[in-house]
Amino acid sequence: FNRHVILRANATPADMADWMNEAHAVCEQCEHFIPVAAASNSRNENGELVFGMNDAGGVLATWPGTLGIAAAVKGYRIDLVDKFAATVRREWNACGLRKGYMYMADTMTDPRWQRTYGTFGEDPALISEIMTHIIPGIQGSAQGVTADGVAVTTKHFPGGGARENGFDPQYAAGQWTVYATPGSLETYHLPPFAAAVKAGTA
C-alpha cells in the first residue's frame, strides 16, 4: 500500500479533504497505522492550469505567480510573503495536504530557461529574503513543521537556473551548467539555498 503520493488533480478543497480522510481510514485498518503523506506542487498562485507545472488553477486562494509576488515584495514590503504563506498553510492543512514541492530558490540567470515563471527572479538577496519568510510561514515555525504546518521541499538546486541554452536541468539536455562570470555560483546561486536551509526547509 503506497503511503506517499503526489496529488496532480485539480480537485476542490472538499474533494481533497474527503479523499485524504478515506485514505487515512484505509490506513487505520492496516496492522501498523502509517498515515498517507500527500504532496503537491504549489497551488496558490497563477490561475492558469498547466499539468506538472501549476497543479491547480483557481481552486484555492489565487495569488500572482512567484515573479509577481517578488515584484510586489520589491515594490511594497516583505510582510506580503508572510500573508501569502499563512494562506497556503491554512488552506493546505484544511485539505489534508501536508507536503509541498515548493518554492523555487533557483536564481534565474538565463532568461531562456523555461522554468523562469516559477522563480522569484534574478536577485539573490531578494530570493533569500523571501525564503527566510515563506518557509517558516508555511511550515508554521522557523524550528520546523508544526502540527498545522505543511512541510516545504525547496526546489531545485544551486545552479539550476543557469543551464546551457536555457534547457531544464531535469532532463539530459540540461545537464551542463554555464556560469557567465567567475564566482557566479557563490554570488548568485548558493545564497538563496543557504537561506532556505537556515529557514528550516524540509
Please state what every model-predicted region is:
Residues 1-202:
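Glycoside hydrolase catalytic-domain context in secreted enzymes
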